[in-house]
């Protein structure tokens, strides 16, 4: 039996992903060690899990290093990889927003600078609005940018909004809501179709309360 490999995101969504797979009866015994290893092999059921950075999950899946993956919709929209998005997993709820100091709301000028970890999402959003902006790509601590004058606003993912409030920023506009999605490598969907569809079915039953 061919091994099916699944890329799980390290960080805030790991626990929810593990709970979902366990509820679906997928590799229960192996997943209890998820916090200690980067690769977990369930030889009995021919399933291999790997823990990777959330931003890297689509790359692993697109290139076939993983057959399936769990990834936020925000990352999928940013990267636009060549893969299948097959299931909304209904966890990891957050919002992609434009945020900035409160006074920016009243003077939303053109030619503004936008700091973000999601340059493609930001560029597409402002282009649709017909607004001319300069995109500044950052890799972390995006909230700092308006405070130190690097940008007028930011585009970032928000869960509770607490980090924004702590830095004196407010949500100006919501771009889209985001949840975790199940993604599949296109070749794997053909070569391992039966096994992958079985996993999708089990997960869907749990999500739908079956």
UniProtKB/Swiss-Prot annotation:
Its EC number is 2.4.2.17. Pathway: Amino-acid biosynthesis; L-histidine biosynthesis; L-histidine from 5-phospho-alpha-D-ribose 1-diphosphate: step 1/9. InterPro entries: ATP_PRibTrfase_cat (IPR013820), ATP_PRibTrfase_CS (IPR018198), ATP_PRibTrfase_HisG (IPR001348), ATP_PRibTrfase_HisG_short (IPR024893). PROSITE patterns: ATP_P_PHORIBOSYLTR. The keyword Transferase applies. One of its GO terms (molecular function) is ATP binding. It catalyses: 1-(5-phospho-beta-D-ribosyl)-ATP + diphosphate = 5-phospho-alpha-D-ribose 1-diphosphate + ATP. It is found in: Cytoplasm. CDD domains: PBP2_HisGs. One of its GO terms (cellular component) is cytoplasm. GO terms for biological process: L-histidine biosynthetic process. Pfam families: HisG (PF01634). Keywords: Amino-acid biosynthesis, ATP-binding, Cytoplasm, Glycosyltransferase, Histidine biosynthesis, Nucleotide-binding, Transferase. The keyword Thylakoid does not apply. Belongs to the ATP phosphoribosyltransferase family. Short subfamily. Lacks the C-terminal regulatory region which is replaced by HisZ. Heteromultimer composed of HisG and HisZ subunits. Catalyzes the condensation of ATP and 5-phosphoribose 1-diphosphate to form N'-(5'-phosphoribosyl)-ATP (PR-ATP). Has a crucial role in the pathway because the rate of histidine biosynthesis seems to be controlled primarily by regulation of HisG enzymatic activity. This is ATP phosphoribosyltransferase. The lineage of its organism: Bacteria, Bacillati, Bacillota, Clostridia, Thermoanaerobacterales.
